[in-house]
Amino acid sequence: MKRIEEIQLPEELRYSPDHEWVRLEGDLARVGLTDYAQDQLGDIVYVELPSIGAHIAQGAVFATVESVKSVSECFMPLSGEVVAVNGPLSDNPVLLNQSPYGDGWMVLVKPDDPAAVSQLLTAEAYLTRLKGGV
């Protein structure tokens, strides 16, 4: 496992307390699992993503990730409609381990309120939570 200081936290992203990240891309938001979360899970062997067109409320489960250690649920950091899913994750779930902020993204959503992204944690605030053991 990585030490907290080794965790990658891109400054341009926003983070949820549940260890998901959000990147605004125009009027859409790309969502994935943080480097910290993938590191804690260990080798990821299966990912279940939602259906395109599904509307998922903030805080609701949007994906399930299975690793050699455990099965974990991922919680939607902002309400919106799923407009795309990362299909290659189904065949190659280790992408979540190898590239959590790149090829390992999970869903692309059209947020109900794009301004809600500003309510999520900055990289600095997320790191502070991690150091606090949350």
Language model regions located:
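Acidic, low-complexity mobile loops and tails
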Residues: 1-61, 94, 98-106, 110-134
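Small beta-strand-rich domains/subdomains or short beta-sheet motifs embedded
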Residues: 14, 48, 66, 72-76
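Residue-level recognition of beta-strand microenvironments
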Residues: 22-24, 68, 85-88
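Short glycine-rich, polar/acidic loop-and-turn segments at beta strand-coil junctions
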Residues: 35-37, 69, 78
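Short, well-structured beta-strand-loop connectors
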Residues: 51-65, 76, 81-84
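Short histidine
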Residues: 62-64, 71, 91-93
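Charged, amphipathic alpha-helical coiled-coil/dimerization segments
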Residues: 79, 83-84, 90-97
